[in-house]
A protein has these predicted regions:
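Catalytic donor/gating beta->alpha subdomain of glycosyltransferases that bind UDP-sugars
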Residues: 1, 28, 33-96
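A short, acidic, flexible beta-alpha connecting loop/helix-capping segment that sits on the rim
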Residues: 64, 190-191
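Surface-exposed charge patches
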Residues: 25, 48, 182
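Membrane-embedded multi-pass helical conduit in multi-pass membrane proteins
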Residues: 98, 102-183
Length: 204
């Protein structure tokens, strides 16, 4: 879904890993080699530099990313998400802050709705709040069911909803952990990172 949204809003479109392509002329004119030599990440570092230089990044509609990540363990997914959020924090702080708003919108309403239902069962929450929470969760389930087609394969609704709950919880946990982060761990190496993603120090 995020990839589709990037295609609709060019201010959020950025180079994306293995799907990225750049001409040799642009590589040399914008000194990409020098940037990458001192940076903690390749694609996201360009997202923080190219817009300031008036360079537009276009998302290729045909570049639908395929991955074999379905078999990955949950800790592998968490480590991947850690890096993605941290890359934004270091390279594009404005998008990282906006991501925090998106995280709150994604995680807090479902959590409050579930707590309201639990409050109704224990007699703590009012009937009105329980009704609103129930209607919200029904609407969320309907919307999520409609979006199942984005996954590229048919998934049972219960599994899709469970995936959303796990993703939202992990997303919130990961984002909170980045608030005070000053670096990241990658393949056993700790990178202390400064403004713009520039590596200040490394240690094994």
């Amino acid at each position: 879904l995020m990839r589709y949204l990037q295609g609709l809003a060019r201010q959020f479109t950025q180079p994306w890993g293995g799907a990225m392509c750049i001409s040799r002329q642009a590589f040399e004119v914008h000194q990409v080699g020098e940037l990458w030599a001192a940076n903690v990440v390749d694609d996201c570092s360009l997202a923080g530099v190219l817009p300031a230089r008036g360079v537009r990044v276009k998302l290729c509609p045909g570049a639908l990313l395929r991955t074999e990540a379905a078999a990955h363990r949950l800790d592998v997914w968490r480590a991947w998400m850690d890096r993605q959020v941290l890359f934004l924090k270091f390279c594009v702080p404005s998008q990282w802050r906006l991501l925090g708003v998106f995280c709150a919108v994604m995680a807090l309403p479902p959590l409050m709705a579930v707590l309201s239902l639990l409050g109704g069962l224990t007699g703590v929450a009012s009937t009105g709040s329980v009704a609103v929470a129930f209607l919200y969760l029904i609407g969320l389930a309907a919307a999520m069911g409609h979006w199942r087609g984005l996954a590229g394969s048919a998934q049972p609704l219960w599994r899709w909803l469970l995936s959303f709950a796990l993703s939202a919880g992990m997303f919130a946990w990961v984002y909170v952990r980045t608030l005070r982060a000053q670096g990241l761990l990658w393949h056993g190496i700790w990178y202390e990172v400064g403004e713009g993603g520039r590596v200040r120090a490394m240690r094994r």
